């Protein structure tokens, strides 16, 4: 179920009236759903823009159309038009399921490791243009990772592995006993910090 506040409905209605297009509504979709990059997208939608499989939510003076593939990701979403402490007004969308949900404790260790890597570790590494991919998780709980981007060949990869990634995975996932690097760092062509510079 999606909640859209009266203030948000008034805001949309005024914008739609200004456009003056009969039957115009607002279309809501999830972009990159289930990933750390997930976001909600709102756009005007004329009747000809609709595919016909959208979920229609009748609002005061217009219809909110939710793209069918986005419905599960938008469950529990709240759309509001709020006044910030600075006095500015802003449209807000809170969609708690849009980035996906962490796997249950009963999920495999591989699924849980991948979730933490994609949702906690890689967003931090992205600030340096880096990333890691899970290559393997052994039955004993040893995680084998492969660095990429700015982390591939980086002189600080060992520190990142031990003080950042291993600490995070072992702290979040009981059962992970070690994290190892499977990357051939000599082949990195654009490291964040070249290996010969890190001392």
Curated annotation (Swiss-Prot):
Binds 1 [4Fe-4S] cluster per subunit. The cluster is presumably bound at the interface of two monomers. This is Fe/S biogenesis protein NfuA. Keywords: 4Fe-4S, Iron, Iron-sulfur, Metal-binding. GO terms for biological process: iron-sulfur cluster assembly; protein maturation. Coiled coil: none annotated. InterPro entries: Fe/S_biogenesis_protein_NfuA, FSCA_dom_sf, HesB-like_dom_sf, NIF_FeS_clus_asmbl_NifU_C. It comes from the Bacteria. Its cofactor is [4Fe-4S] cluster. Homodimer. [4Fe-4S] cluster binds at residues 151, 154. Involved in iron-sulfur cluster biogenesis. Binds a 4Fe-4S cluster, can transfer this cluster to apoproteins, and thereby intervenes in the maturation of Fe/S proteins. Could also act as a scaffold/chaperone for damaged Fe/S proteins.
């Amino acid at each position: 179920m999606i909640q859209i506040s009266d203030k948000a409905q008034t805001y949309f209605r005024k914008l739609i009236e200004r456009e003056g297009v009969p039957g115009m509504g607002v279309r809501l979709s999830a972009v990159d759903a289930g990933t750390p990059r997930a976001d909600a997208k709102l756009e005007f939608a004329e009747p000809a823009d609709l595919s016909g499989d959208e979920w229609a939510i009748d609002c005061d003076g217009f219809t909110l159309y939710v793209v069918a593939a986005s419905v599960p990701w938008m469950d529990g979403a709240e759309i509001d038009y709020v006044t910030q402490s600075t006095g500015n007004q802003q449209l807000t969308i809170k969609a708690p399921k849009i980035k996906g949900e962490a796997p249950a404790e009963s999920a495999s260790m591989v699924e849980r490791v991948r979730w933490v890597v994609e949702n906690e570790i890689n967003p931090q590494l992205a600030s340096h243009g880096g990333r890691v991919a899970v290559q393997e998780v052994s039955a004993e709980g040893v995680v084998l990772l492969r660095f990429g981007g700015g982390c591939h060949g980086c002189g600080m990869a060992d520190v990142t592995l031990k003080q950042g990634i291993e600490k995070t995975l072992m702290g979040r996932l009981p059962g992970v006993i070690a994290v190892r690097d499977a990357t051939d760092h000599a082949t990195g062509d654009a490291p964040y910090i070249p290996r010969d510079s890190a001392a």
